[in-house]
């Protein structure tokens, strides 16, 4: 048995960041992880491995689509799937550097202030639940992670399948679907709703679907999946179209079930502790991430909010500061979201639909990458930047980007929103030329007297 100021259960982005910050603030800290490796889903079977695949296949796309346009001629590129798949222990070093105790094994909470790992029970003044999430799946579909897979299985396929059906047109489905489409698979995306990327700006969603269709992905929207049948090395996905209840089926070598994720809290003993839970399985936490059990906190995918690694990291740092007697800060209005397709999509703040529902008067500044010299020079001029600002005050309320390096460009607008900046503030800021980021300034100018290169 050991005594700690804080024990964090879960070593993913929220948990390990929380542990490091707690230690930096002078708290004796331990972090429990049972998966055998720190970093959680993001580092091991999620964000980082998928971005390695997305980058590799983006480069392949550039070779096939744009090299000849640039005057680069030569032998055709061949795909070595095994080498691509293998390019995927820095956190343990950070733990040692910051004097965080790493407890290997699955953790549970037998009583307030106690964490059991294996046969040992440790005590802590504060416990943080940072156990993340798992794929939610669909009723009636058996996941084997071989031919019917979640994102975990999709990142470790032995070979590129000839055909793939992706169930779900959210971030995970579109990213991995586009990877395999660029590698030569015939990819069909089946989505229950009538549009892809639920919750995203409608104009961006339509533009992304149009571009991905040109890249070879097929879309079946408004389709309710009924089940997956396995026979003779093939999977048959059965679905009905919601508009007329007609029945249909698609065969595929691999089926990727990308219908979302759910909090992973089983085995913690929360029910016996009397921890309040929400109807969808999240731990109920207040504005300081505290549960109804004294000394017990929860962050990341275990609580409400977008299931994003960077949201969990922010909460991890913030709750560490709360425990240390400081003020933890997370601005939930300024949490960006990114889809790492080609082109990338990024968003922060309000959408037009949300502002209309609120009845808030707003103005739109939009600029196409067709007017951006850098984007035109490298044949990546598809897409646009859209900035939404308050009609009266000009304060930036949201932004939506589809185009090259959108996931990096969005942060300029995040910083502006964090400081309560206006669109004019961005418009008055000199941007280096030629850069993609000039499109942000042009969109800000479009909120006022007009963009220059439109």
Swiss-Prot record:
Tell me which Gene Ontology terms the entry assigns under biological process.
Answer: 2-oxoglutarate metabolic process
Q: Which GO terms describe its molecular function?
A: dihydrolipoyl dehydrogenase (NADH) activity; flavin adenine dinucleotide binding
Q: Which UniProt keywords apply?
A: Cytoplasm, Disulfide bond, FAD, Flavoprotein, NAD, Oxidoreductase, Redox-active center
Look up the record and name the cofactor or cofactors this protein needs. Answer: FAD
Q: How is the cofactor bound?
A: Binds 1 FAD per subunit.
Question: Where is FAD bound in this sequence?
Answer: 33-42, 51, 107, 301, 309
Name the residues that bind NAD(+).
Answer: 168-172, 191, 225, 258-261
Q: Which cysteine pairs make disulfide bonds?
A: 42-47
Which EC class, in a word?
oxidoreductase
Which PROSITE patterns does this one have?
Answer: PYRIDINE_REDOX_1
Q: State the InterPro entries in the record.
A: Class-I_Pyr_Nuc-Dis_Oxidored, FAD/NAD-bd_sf, FAD/NAD-binding_dom, FAD/NAD-linked_Rdtase_dimer_sf, Lipoamide_DH, Pyr_nuc-diS_OxRdtase, Pyr_nucl-diS_OxRdtase_dimer, Pyr_OxRdtase_I_AS
Show the Gene3D superfamilies listed in the entry.
Answer: 3.30.390.30, FAD/NAD(P)-binding domain (3.50.50.60)
The entry's localization annotation reads: Cytoplasm
Active-site residue numbers: 433
**Role summary:** Lipoamide dehydrogenase is a component of the alpha-ketoacid dehydrogenase complexes.
**Subunit field text:** Homodimer.
Q: What else is known?
A: The active site is a redox-active disulfide bond.
Against PANTHER family, the record matches this protein to: DIHYDROLIPOYL DEHYDROGENASE, MITOCHONDRIAL, DISULFIDE OXIDOREDUCTASE
Q: Which family does it belong to?
A: Belongs to the class-I pyridine nucleotide-disulfide oxidoreductase family.
- Per its UniProt record, what NCBIfam families does this chain match? lipoamide_DH
Q: What is this protein called?
A: Dihydrolipoyl dehydrogenase
């Amino acid at each position: 048995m050991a005594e700690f100021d804080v024990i964090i259960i879960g070593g993913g982005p929220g948990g390990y960041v929380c542990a490091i910050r707690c230690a930096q603030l002078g708290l004796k800290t331990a972090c429990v992880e049972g998966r055998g490796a720190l970093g959680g889903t993001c580092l091991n079977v999620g964000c980082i491995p998928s971005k390695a695949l997305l980058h590799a296949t983006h480069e392949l796309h550039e070779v096939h689509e744009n090299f000849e346009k640039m005057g680069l001629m030569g032998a055709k590129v061949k795909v070595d799937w095994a080498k691509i798949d293998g390019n995927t222990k820095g956190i343990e070093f950070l733990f040692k550097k910051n004097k965080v105790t790493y407890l290997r094994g699955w953790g549970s909470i037998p009583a307030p202030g106690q964490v059991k790992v294996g046969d040992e029970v440790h005590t802590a003044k504060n416990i943080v639940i940072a156990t993340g999430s798992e794929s939610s799946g669909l009723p009636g579909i058996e996941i084997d992670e071989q031919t019917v897979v979640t994102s975990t299985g999709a990142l470790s396929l032995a070979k590129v399948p000839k055909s793939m059906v992706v169930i779900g047109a959210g971030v995970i489905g579109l990213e991995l679907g586009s990877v395999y489409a660029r590698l030569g698979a015939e990819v069909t995306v089946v989505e229950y709703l009538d549009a892809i990327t639920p919750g995203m700006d409608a104009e961006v969603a339509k533009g992304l679907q149009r571009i991905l269709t040109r890249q070879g992905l097929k879309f079946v929207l408004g389709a309710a999946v009924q089940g997956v049948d396995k026979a003779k090395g093939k999977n048959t996905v059965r679905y009905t179209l919601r508009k007329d209840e007609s029945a249909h089926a698609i065969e595929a070598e691999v089926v990727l079930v990308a219908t979302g994720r759910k909090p992973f809290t089983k085995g913690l003993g929360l029910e016996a502790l009397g921890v309040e839970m929400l109807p969808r399985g999240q731990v109920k936490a207040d504005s300081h991430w505290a549960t109804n059990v004294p000394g017990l906190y929860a962050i990341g995918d275990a609580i409400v909010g977008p299931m994003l690694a960077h949201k969990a990291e922010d909460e991890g740092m913030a709750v560490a500061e709360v425990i240390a007697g400081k003020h933890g800060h997370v601005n939930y209005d300024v949490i960006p979201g990114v889809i790492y397709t080609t082109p990338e999509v990024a968003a922060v703040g309000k959408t037009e639909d949300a502002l209309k529902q609120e009845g808030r008067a707003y103005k739109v500044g939009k600029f196409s990458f067709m007017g951006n010299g850098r984007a035109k020079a490298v044949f990546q001029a598809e897409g646009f930047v859209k900035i939404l600002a308050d009609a009266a005050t000009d304060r930036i309320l949201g932004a939506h980007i589809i185009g090259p390096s959108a996931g990096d460009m969005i942060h300029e607008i995040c910083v502006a929103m964090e400081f309560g900046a206006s669109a004019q503030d961005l418009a008055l800021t000199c941007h280096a030329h030629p850069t993609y980021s000039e499109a942000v300034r042009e969109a800000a100018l479009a909120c006022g007297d007009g963009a220059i290169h439109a």
